[in-house]
Amino acid sequence: MLLMDWQGVLSGQPLQWIISGFLTTLWVTLAGVAVATLFALLLLGLRLTGNRVATAVVGVWVSAFRNTPLLVQLMFWYFAAWNWLPRDVITFINAEHPWSVLPGDVWWLTPEFLCSAWGLGVFTSAFLVEEIASGLQAVSAGQREAAIAQGFSAWAAFRHILLPQGLANAWQPIVGQYLNLMKLSSLASGIGFAELTYQVRQIESYNAHALEAFAVGTALYLFFGIVLGMLLTRLGPKSASGKPFRVRTRPFSFRSILHDR
């Protein structure tokens, strides 16, 4: 019978590695979410201009990031693009700065952290802009026509009528993309970033407690995902009653398919 030795993971140096890895995953996820949101909004703005060049730029961005593996992208940013930065910038980032330490003793001004947050962010932005665009397309054309008839300008109609409904339609897929970013942060271990997966593998090499280490790592990812999902749902678009929008779906069945036909 296989006996589990939790003391080999939940005490001493392995425990410190687990805590450090979890906090590092937390911070790089938040940084990646910020980068992804910023770029998704910029890309959405370009697409809404209707300009052919701007639309083409968005199309190339989405195609490039959605159709290449994230691990390859992270390696590109870390091993190739990083060396294109001016030498003074690289020297400044590699130096130790007291103000660059986040709570939990996580250093954010490092090549590994910056490349991981950037890579996760730009990768996720390509998916986010499509989710938001789909949500906006799901808003009926009558909503815009009614807003214009009521005297709203085109921008006011978009800001106060179309965008809130579009975000409500797309919010659950958006939350899913943010959660996916959190899970994909484990790939950053491939460039030597000491997040949770990296630290779990380090414990495996340190004392061969692989099963216990990966069990704890899995539990922490699950905990983080549940908490993050709940927070994002609460922060999402609210209905007039102040409650989060909920998309109503019918249970899947072959009878429903035949009925729709």
Describe each PLM feature range.
Residues 1-261:
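Transmembrane alpha-helices and adjacent helix-loop boundaries
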